Amino acid sequence: MPSTPSLKVVHELPACTLCVGPLEDAVTAPCGHTFCRLCLPTLSQMGAQSSGKILLCPLCQEEEQAETPMAPVPLGPLGETYCEEHGEKIYFFCENDAEFLCVFCREGPTHQAHTVGFLDEAIQPYRDRLRSRLEALSMERDEIEDVKCREDQKLQVLLTQIENKKHQVEAAFERLQQELEQQRCLLLARLRELEQQIWKERDEYITKVSEEVSRLGAQVKELEEKCQQPASELLQDIRVNQSRCEMKTFVSPEAISPDLVKKIRDFHRKILTLPEMMRMFSENLAHHLEIDSGVITLDPQTASRSLVLSEDRKSVRYTRQKKNLPDSPLRFDGLPAVLGFPGFSSGRHRWQVDLQLGDGGGCTVGVAGEGVRRKGEMGLSAEDGVWAVIISHQQCWASTSPGTDLPLSEIPRYVGVALDYEAGQVTLFNAQTQEPIFTFAASFSGKVFPFFAVWKKGSCLTLKG
């Protein structure tokens, strides 16, 4: 890259080349010499030559063609930079070498064939490019600021949602704690009530037994005294004494009544199930929180030609007119089916489907293995790599081998699918009532995908969420 010539900066006022005084109303000739306008000779004084040329600069005697404009060229703002080599002011710029030039530099052999212009003229293209770049950068900056503003708004929305969810979680657990505390108080109150009943019946039992012991003690003492009486006295009251000696059967009272024992046993059974209920609740809560309810979409590469997918790939409907689609080893051609995306090879996952059944039509919802048959006739069973339920207006059955008829009270409109890969479990349930429809036990190997099929005109299913 050409180096910039050495410049020296002085702090003197520019001088006229003719009068050597400060420049007033400065102009420059094409050669680069600078004069006061009043110091420059008139054109008639320069004189026209017979060769058709005129003298433009009285110092360097430079001649130009007569048709060349002879008016002195006005200077732009004069700087205070001088050529260090020649001591002349810098007026020119060489675009080829990117160097500042004085008059002598410009006339030198180095720059004869180069593009040389006045500083003000030479700088204009650069200024234009800088302005253009400045405009582009300003636009880019504005766009980035707009994007940043939008992203900040999205971020703020997310942060607000997170804050709301935090409050919801705190409120939910606070309500749960209140309900658990209420149930704890009820259980303890019931236990205290049973405890009081036990003590009450114990006191009653002790009272009855004590009374009987006292009665028997008094009778024993009386009989002992009779035994010490003389025969004449004892025989005198023989009939009375015999009646007193007759044994009376004492019915021993029960310490705790059978009714109270039954209440205690019933309550004991309830208490025994409490730890298991708490454990199941904890496991179900953890299970629910671990479930991935991510976005499921329909994979168009697997869709049968008899199916029409929505633009957002969330809905599919049946059509009698098969679509002209490129063949693919992934595409179903024997069954109007489509797989969901993504597939899963681990974890717990859940999704929900809205069903619309056409006249005589139906839908299939479930899970299929990655190696499920795509071409020709395919079976719907676990042996074929499909774990699903088939739903029509009249009935619902599971894709077992043979199929399992599911006598439901009503045909579900919304069906949920819960996949537990590690447990090898696929559960389908009524998403409105949360009632289970059917649970498959499986041993997965490789990826499994959400599986859907619809048949007959008017049948349609839509992924929710």
Curated annotation (Swiss-Prot):
Localization per record: Cytoplasm; Nucleus; Cell junction, Focal adhesion
Binding annotation for Zn(2+): 83, 86, 105, 111
GO-annotated biological processes: innate immune response; negative regulation of intracellular transport of viral material; negative regulation of non-canonical NF-kappaB signal transduction; positive regulation of RIG-I signaling pathway; positive regulation of type I interferon production; suppression of viral release by host
Ranges annotated as B box-type zinc finger: 78-119
GO cellular component: cytoplasm; focal adhesion; nucleus
Sequence ranges assigned to domain B30.2/SPRY in this UniProt record: 276-465
Zinc finger residue extent: RING-type: 16-61
InterPro entries assigned: B30.2/SPRY, B30.2/SPRY_sf, Butyrophylin_SPRY, ConA-like_dom_sf, PRY, SPRY_dom, TRIM/RBCC, Znf_B-box
Highest taxon of the lineage: Eukaryota
Principal EC category: transferase
Catalytic activity entry: S-ubiquitinyl-[E2 ubiquitin-conjugating enzyme]-L-cysteine + [acceptor protein]-L-lysine = [E2 ubiquitin-conjugating enzyme]-L-cysteine + N(6)-ubiquitinyl-[acceptor protein]-L-lysine
Enzyme Commission identifier(s): 2.3.2.27
UniProt keywords, alphabetically: Cell junction, Coiled coil, Cytoplasm, Metal-binding, Nucleus, Transferase, Ubl conjugation pathway, Zinc, Zinc-finger
Stretches assigned to coiled coil: 126-229
CDD domains the record matches: Bbox2_TRIM10-like (cd19765), SPRY_PRY_TRIM15 (cd15826)
PANTHER family: E3 UBIQUITIN-PROTEIN LIGASE TRIM (PTHR24103)
Similarity section: Belongs to the TRIM/RBCC family.
Protein task: E3 ubiquitin ligase that plays a role in several processes including innate antiviral immnity, cell migration and chemotaxis. Acts as a 'Lys-63'-specific ubiquitin ligase for MAPK1/ERK2 and MAPK3/ERK1, promoting their activation by facilitating their interaction with MAP2K1 and MAP2K2. Also plays a role in cell migration and chemotaxis by acting as a stable focal adhesion component upon recruitment by multi-adapter protein paxillin/PXN. Functions in the RIGI-mediated interferon induction pathway upstream or at the level of MAVS.
Assembly and oligomerization: Interacts with paxillin/PXN; this interaction recruits TRIM15 to focal adhesions. Interacts with TRIM8; this interaction prevents TRIM8 cytoplasmic translocation.
Protein name, entry field: E3 ubiquitin-protein ligase TRIM15
Species whose genome carries this gene: Macaca mulatta (Rhesus macaque)
Gene designation: TRIM15
